[in-house]
Amino acid sequence: MKNKKIIIIGAGLLQVPAIQIAQDMGLYAIVFDYNKDAHGMKIADLPMVVSTRDVDGSVRAARDLSKQMEINGVITVGTDASTTVAAVANALGLPGNRFEDAYA
């Protein structure tokens, strides 16, 4: 049973290994991407159609999810979505870079 839940921002080919590794570690992979047909969306435990560049939309989606389940982390790999990750982490009280630092 997958207890801990992680949001992975992005579902392209570069994020697929991160999604797979998270799942191999027993994590429940919630994946945000604007493309519902992206490779990572097909293997996500919970795919969510949200643009990686839509910081406010990603924060709203993450906050909504956090009312239904505990979110334990948020990451991205191989993308320029560090500001989105920072904003989501900050909004949910998770460890991460400050938005100002990610934006710099």
Language-model segments: which ranges?
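ATP-binding N-terminal substructure of ATP-dependent carboxylate-amine bond-forming enzymes
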Residues: 1-103
